């Protein structure tokens, strides 16, 4: 059976609800690996259905003959403990390429209290990756989590054996990093210093997934033999960062060298690059197959070269300080773009913003604190073209002029801050600022 349910062709919610039946098993291909995974429909509501992840994970598309061997996927990776994952998901976002394999009996499950989106194969992928880790390290990790009150001595300090993160106050006291082997639950290292033993230690500890390295002085940061999933790093001296295939998130902070290159086995495919920019500078880091890019602290930035550097983006997130964004029409070149978010950015019109037909894969459009004229036109233009759209806090030129240096501007229009509280707080800030400026003027005089 090879039925494709296409909800991205503006299929009504009622039609999706009628197509789905309890017991139906659907299959999809996970994007990064192209492997097939499966899930089953186990409950139907008014606007949402409950699915449960199944344990099918293969390079071969499943057939009806595979149904009898499928079981609920039990999660044991990271903090999960033999847990079945099932979740409510909206009919209107049912995945476009889901293929109906057949229908089998469901098994008893407790009431579903999880709400989210349809599966993407990440749980099956995580399970496979977790099962490839050294068994003794995984076993020690799970034991440490189960003994949350068990304490040990590290660098002369008493800490919990399940401790997740260590900082320089501990690292600087170590004469031998092997002392950290007493911490099987260790998953994050945060440092502002150079520790010669750190990288070799990371290379043999497979469950340490995060490194935050501030003000790194190395020119060549070789992490290629580590097992890091996330890296946050800063340092003007860095010219090369070498990553393992396992790294999926890298965050760059502070001033960056114009020579900076990032080397990854997958060249950025299925990787998230976050950059907290200074002076709107974004070096050409490589990663030509990058799929997710998030730029923060934009002040005055052009997208002119961005799309040629990263032509395969699925997700583009842009956040101002607030700031101005130029050459917005360049986004039309990102034909695979599925998600676009913009926040606190100005300097563009509705005419410059891409037309829906130029972004055929776009499913999510989140715009907040953008020019009011553009916001109104874009919202109307995309209303029937994307499933997930939020256009919030449209701003006029007058508002921008008055609030450019207002630290409370994020409260204006917030659903969490009432208008009266914002007005009172703004008045207090203005009065405090006036007094401060008067005091500075008197001291200078």
Indicate where each model-derived feature is located.
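Intrinsically disordered, low-complexity, charged/polar segments
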Residues: 60-138
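Short terminal alpha-helical segments
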Residues: 395-441
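Core of folded catalytic or high-affinity ligand/protein-binding domains
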Residues: 44, 441-445
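Short beta-strand-centered aromatic/proline hotspots
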Residues: 34-45
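Basic/aromatic-rich interaction segments and small domains that mediate binding to polyanionic partners
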Residues: 43-67
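Mixed-charge, Lys/Arg-rich low-complexity intrinsically disordered regions
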Residues: 1-21
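Concave beta-strand-loop units of leucine-rich repeat
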Residues: 143-376, 380-397
């Amino acid at each position: 059976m090879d039925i494709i349910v296409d909800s991205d062709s503006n299929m009504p919610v009622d039609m999706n609800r009628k197509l789905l039946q309890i017991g139906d098993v659907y299959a999809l291909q996970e994007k990064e690996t192209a492997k097939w995974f499966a899930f089953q429909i186990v409950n139907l509501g008014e606007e949402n259905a409950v699915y449960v992840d199944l344990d099918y994970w293969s390079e071969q598309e499943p057939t009806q003959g595979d149904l009898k061997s499928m079981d609920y996927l039990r999660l044991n990776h990271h903090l999960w403990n033999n847990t079945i994952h099932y979740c409510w998901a909206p009919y209107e976002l049912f995945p476009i390429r889901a293929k109906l394999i057949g229908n089998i009996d469901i098994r008893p499950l407790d009431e579903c209290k999880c709400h989210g989106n349809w599966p993407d194969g990440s749980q099956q992928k995580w399970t496979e990756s977790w099962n490839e880790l050294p068994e003794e390290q995984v076993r020690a990790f799970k034991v440490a989590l189960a003994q949350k009150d068990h304490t040990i001595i590290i660098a002369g300090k008493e800490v919990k054996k399940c401790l997740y993160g260590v900082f320089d106050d501990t690292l600087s006291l170590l004469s031998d990093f092997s002392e950290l082997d007493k911490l099987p639950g260790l998953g994050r290292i945060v440092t502002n210093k150079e520790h010669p033993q750190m990288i070799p230690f990371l290379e043999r500890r497979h469950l340490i997934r995060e490194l935050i390295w501030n003000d790194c002085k190395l020119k060549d940061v070789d992490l290629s033999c580590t097992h890091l999933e996330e890296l946050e790093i800063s340092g003007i001296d860095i010219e090369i960062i070498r990553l393992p295939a396992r790294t999926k998130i890298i965050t760059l902070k502070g001033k960056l060298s114009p020579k900076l290159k990032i080397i990854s086995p997958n060249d950025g495919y299925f990787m998230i690059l976050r950059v907290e920019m200074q002076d709107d500078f974004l070096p050409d880091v490589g990663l030509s197959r990058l799929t997710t890019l998030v730029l923060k602290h934009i002040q005055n930035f052009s997208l002119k070269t961005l799309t040629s550097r990263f032509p395969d983006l699925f997700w583009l997130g842009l956040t101002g300080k607030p700031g101005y964004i130029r050459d917005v029409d360049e986004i039309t070149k990102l034909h695979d773009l599925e998600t676009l978010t913009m926040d606190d950015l100005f300097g563009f019109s509705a005419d410059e913003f891409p037309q829906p037909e130029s972004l055929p894969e776009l499913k999510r459009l989140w715009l907040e604190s953008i020019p009011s004229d553009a916001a109104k036109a874009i919202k109307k233009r995309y209303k029937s073209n994307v499933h997930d759209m939020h256009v919030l806090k449209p701003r006029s030129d007058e508002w921008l002029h008055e609030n450019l240096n207002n630290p409370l501007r994020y409260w204006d229009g917030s659903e969490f801050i009432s208008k009266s509280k914002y007005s009172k707080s703004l008045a207090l800030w203005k009065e405090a600022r006036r007094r401060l400026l008067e005091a500075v003027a008197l001291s200078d005089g």
